[in-house]
A protein has these predicted regions:
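Conserved C-terminal guanine-recognition region of P-loop GTPase G domains, centered on the G4
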Residues: 1-16, 158-164, 185-249
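Conserved active-site aspartate in kinases
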Residues: 169
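Conserved P-loop NTPase architecture
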Residues: 1-116
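A short, flexible beta-alpha/helix-coil linker loop
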Residues: 25, 173-174
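Conserved hydrophobic/aromatic pocket- or pore-lining residues that grip, position, or stack substrates
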Residues: 84, 130, 149
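Switch I (effector-binding) loop of TRAFAC-class P-loop GTPase G-domains
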Residues: 102, 109-115, 134-166, 174-187, ...
């Protein structure tokens, strides 16, 4: 991948080159509505950018370096690295503050004896629709990838136990999600990690349903969420043909 990028940079140094992660982050950026979400995207983008800085410097070095001198590429690489490290540190520091605030909120809920439910699932599976139905809220529902980036918390009353329960809607997952993205969004995903119950929303009309269920379950394993907490919620049953419904039943 980096060899191909170097060829592009050598021909047109100012050209923008995106890989799969860049594309995902570009979509994320369109849906970021809070400072925390924006910082998480920036951190993931910088983590993905880091390995490329050396390659960019090598291209510039071949273009402007001379024998026995420090090439212009080497100088630029050092400058880019320093700038990259400073940005990374700033983003991590700000996210650490957000994570601390979120932990205080979760600890406060626990001290009050409030139980929590987290809604997870593959992107565009219908998590926010379920959240709206359960909480009677009207958060934006889109037929789009990654429409939810932030963790939104609401509450529902459970007559059977006579208590209110908190419920959170979280970011949608995707196959082959890079570890850097999971790490960057860790503070948001903490709502799921500390939840008493995790509702795994599944689009039952999706031909790739089985594979996507496996993707979500794998990410939950990475987050060390016990399987005992996970409950499947099948969505979009109305979009399944009658014959398929018979097979499912």
């Amino acid at each position: 991948k980096f060899t191909l990028m170097k060829l592009f940079w050598a021909a047109k140094p100012n050209i923008n080159i995106w890989d799969r992660v860049d594309l995902i982050l570009a979509i994320f950026s369109r849906h970021a509505k809070t400072k925390e979400a924006t910082l998480q995207i920036e951190l993931a983008r910088m983590q993905n950018m880091g390995p490329r800085i050396y390659g960019m410097g090598m291209v510039l070095s071949r273009q402007g370096g001379g024998v026995g001198t420090r090439g212009i590429g080497e100088t630029n690489t050092e400058l880019m690295r320093r700038h990259w490290k400073a940005q990374m540190k700033n983003a991590k520091d700000e996210l650490a503050k957000s994570a601390a605030t979120r932990k205080q909120q979760m600890d406060h809920r626990k001290n009050l004896g409030l139980q929590t439910i987290s809604i997870v699932g593959y992107t565009n599976a219908g998590k926010t629709s379920l959240f709206n139905i359960l909480t009677h809220k009207k958060h934006l529902v889109e037929n789009a990838l990654f429409a939810t980036l932030d963790s939104t918390v609401g509450e529902i009353f459970m007559p059977s136990i006579g208590k209110k329960i908190l419920i959170s809607d979280t970011i949608g997952f995707i196959a082959n999600l890079p570890p850097a993205l999971i790490e960057a969004f860790k503070s948001t995903l903490m709502e799921s990690v500390h939840a008493d119950i995790v509702l795994h929303v599944i689009d039952i009309s999706d031909p790739q349903m089985i594979d996507k269920v496996a993707v979500v379950s794998d990410i939950l394993d990475q987050l060390k969420i016990p399987q005992q907490k996970e409950i499947y919620v099948f969505n979009k049953i109305d979009a399944v043909a009658n014959l398929d419904k018979q097979k499912i039943s």
